[in-house]
Amino acid sequence: MPFQKLVTPSLTDLFVSQMESMILSGELKPGEQLPTERELAARTDVSLAVVHSGITRLAEAGFLRVAPRKGVYVTDYLRTGNLETLNAILKYRGSIFSKDLFLPTMTYLQHLMDWLLEAACRECGGETWSALEQILDDYRKSIRQTEAAELAFRFYHETAVGCGSYVYPYLTAAAKDLITQCFASSIRILGKDPFLPPLEETLAALRDRDAETACGAFRKICRQWEEIYTSTFSE
């Protein structure tokens, strides 16, 4: 029976996770002012450095607003958030398969992959194909669910790197948590095997410069995600 590796989170990670949970649960409300960093450090029993680093990360993720000489405030993260905010919401929920997250995410990822795979069929060459074959080999050998999900993302990110422009890998990397969460949630339910044939089909289509088939292979993956979503909310 395979076991997952245990990783100890840092104090900053724990502080950020606690604050995110309090904001997302509504315990801390938009516009509410936080205690001073010194007070937060005392209440959470961590150092000022941990609190300061955590607040910086939460501000970058759109959850907090730092007003110089005035204080730190909880934001209306629907208006101030970004992909980091969405990633935090996904982690808080524990699954992509919820009514308010799944369908918009599918639409976004399908447009992203259509754009990426069409470019990859034009631009990618032998070096990229070899790298993708190695990733698929690692995917076949992977044991842990999280490893398989990470390798599935790496497959598309490596494809983006092969497109010859900074834009493709950067925008694909921005969607990393979305893509990884989709694969991780579905691999927990279906296992990794159903996703290998579409990935193999994608690589074959890239070699053939067949954008329609490459995009169609990703849509096969999306349909498997959609089946899980439908069964989740079938009642």
Predicted features, each with a name:
Residues 1-111:
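Short linear motifs at protein or domain termini
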Residues 235:
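Membrane-interface aromatic/basic loop that binds lipid-linked glycans or pyrophosphate carriers
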Residues 108-184, 195-199, 213-228, 232:
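Conserved amphipathic alpha-helical segments that form helical-bundle/coiled-coil interaction surfaces
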Residues 10, 190-194:
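Short helix-capping and inter-helix turn/linker motifs at the boundaries of alpha-helical repeat units
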Residues 35, 40, 46, 52, ...:
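Generic alpha-helix signal with a bias toward terminal, lower-confidence helices
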